Amino acid sequence: MQITDMSFVLDFQKRKGYVPYESPELAAYKTEYKSSPEGLWTWGVIIVAGIAYNPNLVPADQAPKSWKDLLDPRWKDAINVKVSTSGLQHVTWYMIRQLYGDDYWKKFGELNPRAFDSYVQQFDRTVNGQDKVALTAQYSGYLMMKAKGAPVEFVIPPDGVVAAPQPWGIVKEAPHPAAAQLFMDWFLSLPGQTGNAEVLLTHSARSDVPPPPGGVSINEFKVLTPTDWHAFEQTHAQFVREWNKITGLR
């Protein structure tokens, strides 16, 4: 099972929802990419996000270059984000808040951002000209759209791109536990992770896996991700409350 919100991953672990299985592939993963104790879950995917814009609507010299540039009033009613159920959006809120404080999101809320469930909706609106800019724009979505020739550009802020994990683990009372273990062995392996990166255009937590087609290595980014996931988990209710207010979903 994979969950894309670390708050739910840690809660599921507390509820003893995972069955321990120490795949031999775990040796290829850094300690911070694995559960404590090991064998409950492992980062199967790293999702990177930055800023995207439509170059047909926003000239390159006028495009946002940093997260702070997104506070410019000219993006009012022209910027989209993810909804509060997104683990990636929670990470973005958390990390930008650490960088710039609470005032950042208060000012951002004045832009009337539109929130959507899927990165596909975010990029569709940006490419179609309904919005000019996307915040928490997934790098994988950008690569997919760019490969199709869509008018979209990706901005790597100098203050860093946001990165969130997609942990994978085996649930208790799985109907076919042996098959689940075999799948985890394959998925966490070099061939499994390489195939996943090629198909989904995401990054792997394994250092020996090439970057997604058309993309650059995650090592070339300054990465913004929580170092204390338990502290991050404690902010979930606050994030949902504030984000729903910012996006008009309260």
Q: Could you describe each region identified by the protein language model?
A:
Residues Q2-Q130:
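Extracytoplasmic ligand-binding site segments that recognize negatively charged/polar headgroups
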Residues V9-D11, K132-P151, L200:
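A ligand-binding cleft/hinge motif common to bilobed small-molecule-binding domains
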Residues L10, K68, K106, D124, ...:
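Solvent-exposed, polar/charged alpha-helical surfaces in well-ordered, non-transmembrane soluble domains
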Residues A28-T31, I47, W75-T85, K107-G109, A115-F116, F187-P210, ...:
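Periplasmic-binding protein-like
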Residues G50-L57, A164-H176, G195-N196:
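A bilobed periplasmic-binding-protein/Venus flytrap-type ligand-binding module shared by bacterial periplasmic
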Residues Y104-K107, Q166, P175-F187, G195-E198:
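Short amphipathic alpha-helical coupling segments at ligand-binding clamshell hinges
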Residues T194-R250:
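C-terminal capping/gating helix-and-loop segments adjacent to ligand/active sites or protein-protein/ligand interfaces
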